[in-house]
């Protein structure tokens, strides 16, 4: 069902702040959205892993994150 839909990486930045989203399979073959955010040049920050039932659901979650980041003034880097 998820053929043709693979891993995805996106990054947003605003000033010294960054936000990353990564869609990939975990060791069990399940799709996981990993969110990483913090300040550039700092070891402080947060990581959050959100499991999703399919690659499509994970990619839709990235689009939701993208809309939220744009609304908050972040520029998409990749």
Question: Model features per residue range: what roles?
Answer:
Residues 1-32:
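Short N-terminal "domain-start" leader segments
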Residues 9-13, 38-39, 69-72:
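A broad, low-specificity signal for short, low-complexity segments enriched in glycine/proline
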Residues 23-48, 63, 72:
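Short aromatic-glycine-(Arg/Gly/Cys) micro-motifs in beta-strand/loop hairpins
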Residues 54-62:
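Short amphipathic alpha-helices within nucleic acid-binding modules
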Residues 62-78:
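C-terminal structural segments of small proteins and small subunits
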């Amino acid at each position: 069902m998820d053929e043709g839909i693979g891993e995805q990486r996106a990054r947003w930045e605003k000033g010294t702040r960054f936000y990353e989203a990564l869609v990939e399979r975990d060791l069990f073959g399940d799709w996981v959205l990993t969110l990483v955010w913090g300040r550039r040049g700092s070891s402080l920050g947060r990581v959050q892993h959100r499991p999703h039932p399919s690659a499509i659901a994970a990619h839709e979650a990235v689009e939701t994150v993208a809309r939220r980041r744009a609304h908050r003034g972040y520029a998409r880097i990749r």
